[in-house]
Amino acid sequence: MNFTKIFVLIAMAALLLVGQSEAGGLKKLGKKLEGAGKRVFNAAEKALPVVAGAKALGK
């Protein structure tokens, strides 16, 4: 039982230390996700007033 907890902690520490060298790829992925999030937010920002107006007309 304790072995699994210790193993998980060691594995997490190893991933954090090794993951530092892979920051370039992760940064690119993060930028892509951020851009997609911005596009979704902007589209929702434009569409929500239209949807709210259509609901008000339907009442």
Swiss-Prot record:
<dbReference type="GO" id="GO:0019731">
    <property type="term" value="P:antibacterial humoral response"/>
</dbReference>
<comment type="function">
    <text>Cecropins have lytic and antibacterial activity against several Gram-positive and Gram-negative bacteria.</text>
</comment>
<dbReference type="InterPro" id="IPR000875">
    <property type="entry name" value="Cecropin"/>
</dbReference>
<feature type="signal peptide">
    <location>
        <begin position="1"/>
        <end position="23"/>
    </location>
</feature>
<dbReference type="Pfam" id="PF00272">
    <property type="entry name" value="Cecropin"/>
</dbReference>
<keyword id="KW-0399">Innate immunity</keyword>
<dbReference type="GO" id="GO:0045087">
    <property type="term" value="P:innate immune response"/>
</dbReference>
<dbReference type="GO" id="GO:0050829">
    <property type="term" value="P:defense response to Gram-negative bacterium"/>
</dbReference>
<dbReference type="GO" id="GO:0050830">
    <property type="term" value="P:defense response to Gram-positive bacterium"/>
</dbReference>
<dbReference type="GO" id="GO:0005615">
    <property type="term" value="C:extracellular space"/>
</dbReference>
<comment type="similarity">
    <text>Belongs to the cecropin family.</text>
</comment>
<dbReference type="InterPro" id="IPR020400">
    <property type="entry name" value="Cecropin_insect"/>
</dbReference>
<keyword id="KW-0929">Antimicrobial</keyword>
<keyword id="KW-0732">Signal</keyword>
<protein>
    <recommendedName>
        <fullName>Cecropin-C type 1</fullName>
    </recommendedName>
</protein>
<keyword id="KW-0964">Secreted</keyword>
<keyword id="KW-0044">Antibiotic</keyword>
<keyword id="KW-0391">Immunity</keyword>
